[in-house]
Amino acid sequence: MKKVTIRDIMKKYKNGEKIVMVTAYDYPFAKLVDEAGVDMILVGDSLGMVVLGYPSTNQVTMKDMLHHVAAVARANPKAMIVGDMPFGSYEVSEEEAVRNAVELVRAGAEAVKLEGGKEVADKVEAIVKAGIPVMGHLGLTPQKRHALGGYRLRGKTEEEARELLEDAKALEEAGVFSIVLEFVKAEVAKKITEEVGVPTICIGAGPWCSGQVLVIHDILGLAPFSPPFAKKYFDCGKAIVEAVKKFAEEVRSGEFPGEGYYW
């Protein structure tokens, strides 16, 4: 098994091949998405809402992230593991940002992701200097949704578009190996992709990026609420309910466990 590395990601980028990233938060899902052939597995702080039942990503702690990164790492995937740095884990100081990034790597992450542009460039640079690859995240940055006026499309105005491009260039200069663009106007994401020299991984930001990412629970129809840009490929939630209903019916009728299911 040849492990996917940053060299492989950059090779795909330079060859014009689309890069695929999907979230996973535990051992079995990491095994499955890796078998599907994704390039990167993102252990995202989105786990707070889709797995832990938190109202937002802001409640996710380093303890939560370390637990789930370690679970994914135990699956020993070929895909590169990217661990999210949760809210409050990198904003205070460069030293704290590096310390928490190191903890995620010790848990099994092979790169870390953090939200923000120019204002976090110093933290990005410090983490990169510590030898840890960093993925940036611009556009709809859920950890900062209150400051941005909620969950809304970014890049609709000329000023926002200019700021996003400036932020992307600042992140590139700080040393990121890629940048997630979330819920950004497609034309703006296209311009950013054309003007930076690192891959852009988009979610709800159009088809002109270097790659795409989706939350596994959105792909499978497991999330109670999915954003408008998330395509559902299978209604797994409905299938699970039907399967458990069938089990319950068979238990109550005495049909289960039938012959062959006991000794």
UniProtKB/Swiss-Prot annotation:
Binds 1 Mg(2+) ion per subunit. Its cofactor is Mg(2+). One of its GO terms (biological process) is coenzyme A biosynthetic process. 3-methyl-2-oxobutanoate binds at D45, S46, D84, K113. The active site is at E182 (proton acceptor). Pathway: Cofactor biosynthesis; coenzyme A biosynthesis. It is found in: Cytoplasm. InterPro entries: Pantoate_hydroxy_MeTrfase (IPR003700), Pyrv/PenolPyrv_kinase-like_dom (IPR015813), Pyrv_kinase-like_dom_sf (IPR040442). Its main location: cytoplasm. It is an enzyme of class 2 (transferase). The keyword Cytoplasm applies. It catalyses: 3-methyl-2-oxobutanoate + (6R)-5,10-methylene-5,6,7,8-tetrahydrofolate + H2O = 2-dehydropantoate + (6S)-5,6,7,8-tetrahydrofolate. One of its GO terms (molecular function) is 3-methyl-2-oxobutanoate hydroxymethyltransferase activity. GO terms for cellular component: cytoplasm. CDD domains: KPHMT-like. Its EC number is 2.1.2.11. Mg(2+) binds at D45, D84, E115. Keywords: Coenzyme A biosynthesis, Cytoplasm, Magnesium, Metal-binding, Transferase. Belongs to the PanB family. Homodecamer; pentamer of dimers. Catalyzes the reversible reaction in which hydroxymethyl group from 5,10-methylenetetrahydrofolate is transferred onto alpha-ketoisovalerate to form ketopantoate. This is 3-methyl-2-oxobutanoate hydroxymethyltransferase.
